[in-house]
Amino acid sequence: MNTHLLALQLMAAQGCLGAFDTIYHHELTEALPQRATARRELAIHAVRATIYGVLFVGLSAWVWQGAWAWVLLALFGVEIFLTLWDFVVEDQTRLLPATERVTHTVLAINGGAFIALLMLGMPAATAAPTGFAYAPHGWLSVFLALCGVGVFVSGIRDAFAARALPADAAKAVRFEGPPQTVLVTGATGFIGHSLVPALLASGHRVIVLSREPRKAAWEFGGAVRAVASMAELSPQEGIDVVINLAGARILGWRWSERRKAVLRGSRAGLTEGVVEWIARAARKPRLMINASAVGYYGIQPQGSEQVLNEASPPQAIFMSQLCQEWEAVASRAREHGVPVALARFGLVFGRGGALPSMLLPFRLGFGGRMGTGQQRSSWIHIADLLGAMAHVWRLGANADGAWNFTAPEQPTQQAFAQAAAAELHRPSVVPTPAWPVRLLLGEQSALLLEGAAIAPARLLASGFSFRFPTVREALADLV
């Protein structure tokens, strides 16, 4: 029985399991790079990924002999220590979903098995002359080397995320006034992870509506009250402000009819429940801030110089219709005397969310424009978005109506690519053609390949001052 070959086969399985865990759990469902509480976990992941990268590539086609065998043993020892430390940190900072805990258990068992098999050959390896004996295993070696490259890239991503998380400009935002009770939906998302701490730091009481209330309470250190449905809130609850951020991630799965129904239900459906509670409330909230998106305005012809504002009309395409339906449901709160601020978000730039993924190709030296590069981008820094929320909060009843939460500058995608490359001191020479994006995403590709210039007309007219009005200033703060 060739125990060394069996160990490499188990390593290949480890690579597949690790890729699933990283993409599905760490990036998609748990979104670790967006969580300030995940900084230490991300740092551990970065070191572990670097070691795993060395192990996958180094063992793919070589046998480590002599002194190098002892180095290999030391690397495995460090890897085991980091894994155990990671388990402790995870349990201290977040509530792991069942699938992630099971995956980690399987990874630990499989990892122990391939390490044990490799150790069987350690006596002979340490006795051999120091060096690397070339012993390729065909496609298995190629696959292991590719796993090593992939996990190393993942480690770079985690290292940048861990380094960036501590200095969050959003922490400076304050929601002024006497202590109030605030209901926040979608609190565990990218924006909510910055909004809720800002509300708590400003002295307000926060109630979080979440499908997983125990997990939500855990994420905010027990400082919030978490409920699973509006039915858990009494009509006598006394909520002063409702901030509705709920909504399934719009960029991801193709927009099949089933997916469109999920997107509608997570926005309009949930909002309908909030409005129904407002109708029953003995004391009505003084304000409802309802998140929407600049997708309300649809898309502009590329090369258009027209700049849209809050009075511009919507379009008959799905992204616009989704926003219209969402806003229509939220606006029913006005029937019960509650002012509704419809906050149409541009693409939010922060140390979480979409920006890290957008910048990763540039960090690796493969960045460039997407499609023609002439599509306009309407965006906003996370600190300015929270500042705009605080601005609307202060206006109270005068905040009723639509607001564009976008920066004053609406660059083309080509200009964004050049700005990102300049801030990261990398080239911008590898364009992404439109056809594979359209093939992969279908109708959803319009989010990336099309755009519109949306001005924050009402924010500017009401005296709001942007901290990061240009892309270069925003990127300088975030990269």
Please report, for each region that a protein language model flagged, where it lies by residue.
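Glycine-rich "substrate-gating" loop/helix at the edge of Rossmann-like oxidoreductase active sites
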Residues: P314-M319, R344-G352, T372-A383
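Mid/C-terminal beta-alpha module of Rossmann-like enzyme folds, strongest
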Residues: K171-T181, L395-E443, A476
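Conserved Rossmann-fold NAD(P)-dependent oxidoreductase catalytic core, especially the SDR/UDP-sugar
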Residues: K260, E272-I317
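Alpha-helical substrate-binding/gating segment
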Residues: S331, L359-G367, Q375-P411
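Conserved beta-loop-beta element that borders a ligand/cofactor-binding pocket
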Residues: S292, A328-R351
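C-terminal amphipathic/interface module of NAD(P)-dependent oxidoreductases
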Residues: A167-Q180, A446-V479
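NAD(P)H-binding glycine-rich loop region in Rossmannoid oxidoreductase-like domains
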Residues: R214-G273
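N-terminal Rossmann NAD(P)H-binding glycine-rich loop of SDR-like oxidoreductase domains
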Residues: Q180-S202
